[in-house]
Design a protein with these regions (language model features):
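Conserved N-terminal phosphate-binding loop of PLP-dependent enzymes in the Aspartate aminotransferase
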Residues: 1-193
Length: 193
């Protein structure tokens, strides 16, 4: 549809990239090729910050053809440019992804995680659950004020040894790809209590 109407398709794969959906990228999972794609976080496994913008030849050529001769490709600034340790970390992570077949591991574990995640739908404190692959969101029913229910659940789980992100009253669950079913069971059990 985007190609037919001359619309650029941009995928933000900062969270969904590098296996979180069960495929290397969410775009692959849905069989589309974006014109521009952003990546970060798992690019270096979060060891050091690194962000990436990838684009198709059409976009690249348009930028470079309108840039002064000798310009740096898709220049972003000095703060995040040319950090050798970030590149080394990214290359090491990519090597591990391949050698340990991490994407297939995530793809195989995802149905078990999703089943556990959606088993929480019957809890009185849960308003809505959504998930895909190795990620999920749980909207808590509002307590006395916005953010309180999410924070209380986050704090109780953290004290019980399960760490995740709470944004307002939404719990964001994204288990590590190296976890096992017993770890997912532990996460779900602690969320349930």
């Amino acid at each position: 549809i985007c190609d037919k109407h001359g619309i650029l398709l941009i995928f933000d794969e900062v969270i969904t990239g590098w296996g979180r959906t069960g495929s290397k990228f969410g775009a692959h999972e849905f069989g589309v090729t974006p014109d521009i794609m952003t990546m970060a976080k798992a690019t270096t496994n979060g060891v050091v910050p690194m962000g990436v913008v990838a684009c198709n030849d059409y976009i690249y050529d348009a930028v470079m053809d309108s840039s002064p001769m000798g310009s740096v490709e898709l220049f972003h600034g000095y703060t995040y440019s040319g950090i050798p340790v970030a590149v080394a970390a990214a290359l090491a992570v990519q090597d591990i992804f391949e050698k340990e077949d991490i994407f297939n591991r995530a793809k195989n574990l995802a149905p078990y995680f999703q089943k556990g995640l959606f088993s929480l739908q019957d809890l009185e404190s849960v308003d809505n659950i959504r998930g895909y692959g190795m990620m999920g969101g749980i909207d808590m029913k509002l307590n006395t004020k916005p953010g309180k229910a999410g924070y209380e659940c986050f704090k109780a789980c953290y004290e019980a040894g399960v760490n995740f992100k709470a944004t307002g009253d939404c719990l964001i669950i994204a288990p590590q790809f190296i976890c096992e079913e017993k770890h997912i069971d532990e996460i779900i059990d602690k969320l349930r209590t």
